[in-house]
Amino acid sequence: MVNLGLRRSASGASPVVVQVWGEAALFTRPELKVERVSYPVMTPSAAVGVLESIYWKPQFRWDVVAIEVLAEIKQFTQRRNETTDLASLAEAVSGRRRVDTVANRVQRNAVCLRDVAYRIHAHAVPDKNSDKPEAAYRDQFRRRVTRGSCFSQPYLGVREFSAFFGDPDDRPAQPITEKLGLMLHSVDHSTTPPSFTWFDAELVNGVLRVPEQGIPATGAA
């Protein structure tokens, strides 16, 4: 792999790397309400979802550093069934309300991505209560990637678009440079309601670099 000069962890370590791919993906832009339109690249929040599907412990969090685009960006349109009846987080946890998906089903157009492939670079950041060093989480993650082990099936933005994963290869990133606009950086679920941070995203020679800190703002994820 090409040395991208990515930021190192607090201990001075390079990021772990995993390669992911799939037949389709949908990384929804939050500013478009009527139709779902995908960003042309995987978002950091979607990358965290993939990483946590492979390996997660409450003693650490994933910090995505960069995402490389390895396949040509191709779009297609799909009509998807969705529901307008959504339970709150408290209702979902308690199970006290049944969501009526049949009575509240709507069809929405979605502009999705076809035949995608990415390399995710990320740090495992231990919290203050962790009894293990950062290296222990990195090594366990790498072993799970090599074995193909995961806690749940990773997906690419939406659950119907499954992701495959494996050790990274030497495939070069696509020579694509494009300003992507505002993109979700992270979600803090410790606040009520959850708070979001954002960043001004740009793809440069096929690489999306993610800043260590996002910009606080209000809005939909």
Predicted features along the sequence, with ranges:
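Internal, well-folded beta-alpha domain core
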Residues: E82-T84, E91-A221
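N-terminal, Lys/Arg- and Ser/Thr-rich interaction peptides
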Residues: G5-V34, L208
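Glycine/small-residue-rich interface belts in oligomeric ring/scaffold proteins
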Residues: S9, L32, V37-N81
